[in-house]
Amino acid sequence: MLQKTKGIVLSYIRYRETSIIVKIYTEVLGLQSYIVNGVRSSGNAKSGGGRMGLYQPLTLLELVVYHQERANLHRIREIKCPEPFVYLPMDFQKTGIVLFLTELLSKSLKSEEPNPVLYQFLHHSIHVLDGQQEGVQNFHLQFLLKLSRYLGFATPTADDFLEEVSPYISADAIDREAVERLLLEPYGAPIPLNGERRRHVLQMILQFYRLHVADFGDLKSLPVLQEMQG
């Protein structure tokens, strides 16, 4: 049946010579995969669903899709991007954050059950990242801590968080002050963290996710993010 929904692109893989399979987290249908035929052919580069730019990580979409219960792959009838990014594609640092976040979201979002509250959080956060001018280097840290609330495993305080991760983290990497401020402050708040403290906090947060997300493992994009942030 036809279903209208908003969606956030997580990733895609090439399929055959000219097609892709794209993974999209939707507002109405949860996590879904769609096959898009001919999108990589030169003759279809600017027509309808054939624009590869629509399938870049974290792109915000409006979709009309053919959805069949119990099917693993679905098809897109109509697609548009009513909220194109303004700054994100041209910002080197933000691009690194996007690659990191999409890999993490692909590991963390596994349910086909819709979660409109989670979707709205993701939608809002992506808008913030696009427009944010100050404190961008801390965005991914705040995002991951906030996301854990919507995934159902957030801790109420920094002390509770540290109690969970401290057995797995070296003592010199524990930074209670940073975690507390990142938990409490809104996006963009001036939280002075140097590169070393930022890496330590991220190490703690990723360990926290490993404790709660099955098969979380390591993130291939992490070295790229750390190199970009210095």
Residue ranges with predicted function:
Residues 1-18, 25-230:
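Non-catalytic alpha-helical scaffolds and adjoining flexible linkers that form interface surfaces
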